[in-house]
Design a protein with these regions (language model features):
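Acidic surface patches and DE-rich sequence motifs
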Residues: 11-12, 21, 42, 80, ...
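Short, cationic low-complexity segments
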Residues: 80-97, 152-166
């Protein structure tokens, strides 16, 4: 099968983060913007098209594992001696992110800026409280923003993954 599907696991800054709701990661980027260039001498259309904004790649998701440890791993803040979470002033953190898919591929975001948008889903008997996350794919120092690793390839090494069971 050639389709990429199913959210298996999300690693952010080298650590597995907790559950994402059943909607998984949803595209939230913007399309590139082009400007047409017209010449007075050419009457039937533009002579060129210039990309004025390259757009951006982004995803959104709802984090439903709101354990103190998970919140610290995902958007920062601190955990005190009693296990309470104190949020940071800015609800954001930037680090590599790996999306492991049920189909076997791993999608690496080399420089993912994760921002806590706001709480989602409410506190009620119909669902669980979540933290809405926005994930922007920024370029790293080598100019890379993402790469899709084939089934069985370790994103850390780029080589076939070693099976620990032999």
């Amino acid at each position: 099968m050639k389709a990429i599907y199913g959210l298996n696991e999300v690693k952010f800054d080298g650590q597995v983060i907790g559950w994402i709701d059943e909607q998984g990661l949803q595209p939230a980027g913007t399309a590139p913007t082009q400007v047409d260039v017209y010449a007075a001498q050419v009457k039937d259309g533009p002579i060129a098209t210039i990309t004025s904004n390259p757009g951006k790649k982004a995803f959104t998701c709802n984090l439903i594992d709101l354990s103190t440890e998970n919140l610290v791993k995902t958007i920062g803040g601190t955990k005190d001696a009693n296990g309470n979470w104190e949020p940071p002033e800015k609800w954001e953190k930037t680090a590599p992110m790996d999306i492991s898919c049920d189909s076997g591929e791993t999608i690496r975001f080399f420089n993912a800026k994760v921002t806590g948008n706001d709480f989602a889903n409410g506190i009620n008997s119909q669902g669980v409280l979540a933290l809405g996350l926005n994930i922007e794919l920024l370029k790293d120092d080598k100019g890379k923003s993402l790469k899709i690793f084939a089934k069985g390839i370790d994103p850390e090494t780029g080589a076939p993954a070693v099976n620990p069971e032999g």
